Amino acid sequence: MVIMSEFSAVPSGTGQGQQKPLRVGFYDVERTLGKGNFAVVKLARHRVTKTQVAIKIIDKTRLDSSNLEKIYREVQLMKLLNHPNIIKLYQVMETKDMLYIVTEFAKNGEMFDYLTSNGHLSENEARQKFWQILSAVEYCHNHHIVHRDLKTENLLLDSNMDIKLADFGFGNFYKPGEPLSTWCGSPPYAAPEVFEGKEYEGPQLDVWSLGVVLYVLVCGSLPFDGPNLPTLRQRVLEGRFRIPFFMSQDCETLIRRMLVVDPAKRITIAQIRQHRWMQADPTLLQQDDPAFDMQGYTSNLGDYNEQVLGIMQALGIDRQRTIESLQNSSYNHFAAIYYLLLERLKEHRSAQPSSRPTPAPTRQPQLRSSDLSSLEVPQEILPCDPFRPSLLCPQPQALAQSVLQAEIDCDLHSSLQPLLFPLDTNCSGVFRHRSISPSSLLDTAISEEARQGPSLEEEQEVQEPLPGSTGRRHTLAEVSTHFSPLNPPCIIVSSSATASPSEGTSSDSCLPFSASEGPAGLGSGLATPGLLGTSSPVRLASPFLGSQSATPVLQTQAGLGTAVLPPVSFQEGRRASDTSLTQGLKAFRQQLRKNARTKGFLGLNKIKGLARQVCQSSVRTPRGGMSTFHTPAPSSGLQGCTTSNREGRSLLEEVLHQQRLLQLQHHSSTAAASSGCQQGPQLSPVPYVLAPCDSLLVSGIPLLPTPLLQAGMSPVASAAHLLDTHLHISAGPVALPTGPLPQCLTRLSPGCDPAGLPQGDCEMEDLTSGQRGTFVLVQ
């Protein structure tokens, strides 16, 4: 791997102890943007235009001939693509061991990181971004180029938050009717035909990936994911995915038409443009003009921007050499300066939309510094005051010598030598009054490398397991297949052809949500959704934040110190209304349980303690010095009534049954006393208490009226009467009534064991076995 130090040491003879930035050609390297298995990406600034660029530095010594051919093919594809939503290629430099690819720098990074930080997009925002993505992909297809690796990591955002399609490492030429066979791409975005190892049509492959991208933009999560590659493969082949409740019907229809398992039934790019969801915003239709302004980009047709050429000529750069470089697609220093100045001009125009462009100045063999004020582009387009005097100097030779002298200042000895662009005699041709060399090392080595043919598609690839980490976050095949053993193996999807269980259409059924498998809004990152900085409350983070997945989408940045938003909650149904009935039933049940518990449950428990009286199982000292009652054996009537089997009855039925028995017994005893038996003192009903044990006073339980005490009495009516019973609880000691007990009370001796009262009924609230002594049995 190429490792460059950020600064090069200044020779000690200069007397300066500081370090100056590393220079590569006409670029000052500022910092590292990323590193891969065989390349490193640096952020640099052009020394003439002061424009920031991204330089991809590739170590050719670590590439075999097949992978090096892929690199050359990527360069050739980027030379053919000039679109506002595609990363622009500025310059290509090559040495014996190194390859330098200078491209446009997207200031706001990847769409992947944006979703990680802000959550999923609204459908209006997603529609705007998807129009730009669709325009770029359609432009590629019109030039017979297929991308084959469309994903949010390869969608960059410039300073205006516009989409820039990048990374054509898996791109290739295609011809209609001639299928491709290379299995490449990223697992979550790969089409079923790639997993099956079949030949495929390039545009249909990109349409599937576009459907996954649109799903990620709207939902913040992946439609297909899994803990390992076989599980992911099975889900992709089934074509089943979840639909969140907040997705509109039109958006769902569009995604389902793109994510069709059968490639022949999949929607096309032209049909996507005409879909109702895409046509919902008329303003986007006006902005999406296929005949966009390509002035200055169609250099091979002789359509050049005269203002940019005039500025370059005023700076002392040879005009004829610049035109030749543009016509030959050399992408050397001349073309780089031209394209960079053209970008600065467009940025200036977009910053001042009200200003009208003035007519281009008349061609002159040479422009003086005073003539620069007549151009439309002001001097702010060439910033940096320390360098401006040399740029506007009327002496072209002075500029040439200053730039070349600065180039010589580069430290060419030590380990940094292969990283720096070599100084050769061809560089002198950049400026006017210099001889024009017929050939140059910078552009002849990468002019005709890309060749169409089956050899590019029939590459021998070995099946390897999914690595733990790769240069790309979602990649099936890397160009580092035949690198040194220190490099991770490439990722290849199994080539075994498996028949799809559902050919033709995507399944409408929804998978059950699983926190470990499904999107749990982008663990991710997808919420990730680490993915998290400031965001509106309505945006949800990526659902797969912290989830176990074979593809860490929206997970990598989950722990960057930002607040994680809650994951998107997917319902079983397709629409939000599908869950309203279930939620209503749940709320009704909760309210019903609440109302049922608010009345009678405390009293019912106490009634159970009074009605299910028990005998003494073991004599222990009771709490509070409870007095002992000596009672005779219970009457036979009570025994006969309570010997029936009560197994299988509920607690409430037992209480009601015993309560009715007590009331019947009391009624019969009262009638006998009034007919001539021994008359006892007429006492008012006294509370039936278990006083000393719990110091609780339970007021008299009213007896049911006689008409209700019939065999056919409804248990529901008795339950309702019991639930209305009022209990008076007192914490203080209660004096027991003196005098003879009423006939309804019977004293039980400590050793008695009344028949009909099973031992299991010897349990009372707040009364242990040590507190059981003499009890009062309510008859």
Curated annotation (Swiss-Prot):
Phenotype upon changing T475A: Does not affect phosphorylation by PKA and nuclear export following ACTH treatment
SMART domains named among the record's database cross-references: S_TKc
Main location: cytoplasm
Superkingdom as given in the UniProt entry: Eukaryota
Phosphoserine modification, residue list: S186, S577
Stored CDD domains: STKc_SIK, UBA_SIK1
Residue intervals of the Protein kinase domain: 27-278
Tissue: Expressed in lung, skin, ovary, heart and stomach. No expression in brain, liver or adult skeletal muscle but is present in skeletal muscle progenitor cells of the somite beginning at 9.5 dpc. Present at 8.0 dpc in the monolayer of presumptive myocardial cells but rapidly down-regulated at 8.5 dpc upon primitive ventricle formation, although still present in myocardial cells that will populate the primitive atrium and bulbus cordis. At 9.5 dpc expression is down-regulated in the primitive atrium but observed in the sinus venosus and truncus arteriosus.
EC number: 2.7.11.1
Cofactor: Mg(2+)
Record flagged with keyword Magnesium: yes
Region (RK-rich region) residue spans: 586-612
Domain notes: The RK-rich region determines the subcellular location.
Protein name, entry field: Serine/threonine-protein kinase SIK1
UniProt source species: Mus musculus (Mouse)
